[in-house]
């Protein structure tokens, strides 16, 4: 992996004990890993951490350092951090596995309880996007969405490691619904949608749900152009997208996990430190405060 000229501020030096962390060098430069432009996960991260600023004319500017390693998907971000002791990145909490270590943010862990209590700072919605109104969806797509938002669907959301959204009425459903539903977009939303697809198809054998992974912007565009029934986005719609007639429906809440290689001894980092690192204000692990 190509290293950046950036570093990460985290806990005080007392949290670092390198003797048992073979492969980690506190004097090394940090390998920052970011998602690509178009990723809803990136959009949420830069907004929530302050890496994105608003110019005087109101335009939003993403100040992620150009030296940052850009990962084209959740899987690439995960494997990149897992393979480099000095790397750090961010991804959907539901996509984390034991090849990386999750950092606390300002001492708070991204647990379901902390997210629900509003204590964890990096939280974003998983949305599905359609044109005009959900009432205009074809019957199979509308039924699938109704099922996702029901108690049955939201149970699957929670079992997959995410938080349910709002009240969860029982599923009433439509008799005899059939056909194909195409979902397209975010690689962060994809694992959750795959679980929902699997459970829905078991009880609706006449409906086929196809999940196409790309990124949030592609999912939004596909929904607008009628390429898919439901776009998948791990961010809110932009004003221009809303003005084009698109609507978003939240199907889950997800924590953004900031992850490092297991060899890294740091356990917690502040939002301010994340902002400073991803904008290039600090450059080495030994600058940790």
Q: Where are the regions a protein language model picked out?
A:
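Bacterial N-terminal signal peptides that target proteins for export
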Residues: 1-7
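Hydrophobic alpha-helical targeting segments used for export or membrane insertion
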Residues: 11-12
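Exported/periplasmic ABC-transporter solute-binding proteins
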Residues: 20-289
């Amino acid at each position: 992996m190509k290293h950046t000229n950036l570093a990460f501020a985290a806990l005080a030096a007392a949290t670092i004990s390198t003797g048992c962390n073979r492969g980690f060098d506190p004097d090394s430069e940090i390998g920052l890993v970011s998602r690509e432009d178009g990723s809803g996960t990136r959009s949420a991260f830069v907004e929530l951490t302050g890496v994105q600023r608003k110019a005087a004319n109101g335009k939003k500017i993403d100040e992620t350092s150009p030296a940052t390693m850009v990962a084209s998907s959740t899987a690439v971000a995960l494997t990149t951090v897992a393979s480099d002791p000095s790397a750090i990145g961010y991804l959907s909490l539901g996509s984390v596995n034991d090849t990386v270590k999750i950092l606390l943010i300002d001492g708070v862990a991204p647990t379901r309880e902390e997210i629900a209590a509003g204590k964890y700072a990096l939280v974003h919605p998983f949305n599905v996007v359609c044109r005009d109104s959900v009432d205009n969806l074809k019957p199979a797509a509308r039924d699938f969405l109704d099922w996702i938002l029901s108690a049955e669907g939201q149970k699957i959301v929670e079992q997959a490691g995410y938080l349910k959204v709002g009240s969860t009425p029982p599923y009433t459903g439509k008799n005899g619904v059939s056909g194909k539903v195409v979902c397209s977009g975010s690689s962060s939303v994809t694992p959750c949608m795959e679980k929902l697809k699997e459970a829905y198809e078991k009880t609706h054998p006449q409906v086929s749900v196809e999940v196409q992974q790309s990124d949030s912007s592609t999912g939004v565009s596909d929904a607008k152009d009628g390429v898919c029934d439901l776009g998948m986005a791990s961010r809110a719609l932009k004003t221009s997208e809303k003005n084009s007639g698109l609507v978003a429906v939240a199907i889950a809440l997800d924590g953004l996990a900031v992850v490092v290689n297991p060899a890294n001894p740091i356990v917690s980092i502040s939002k301010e430190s994340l902002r400073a690192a991803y904008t290039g204000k600090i450059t080495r692990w030994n600058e940790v405060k």
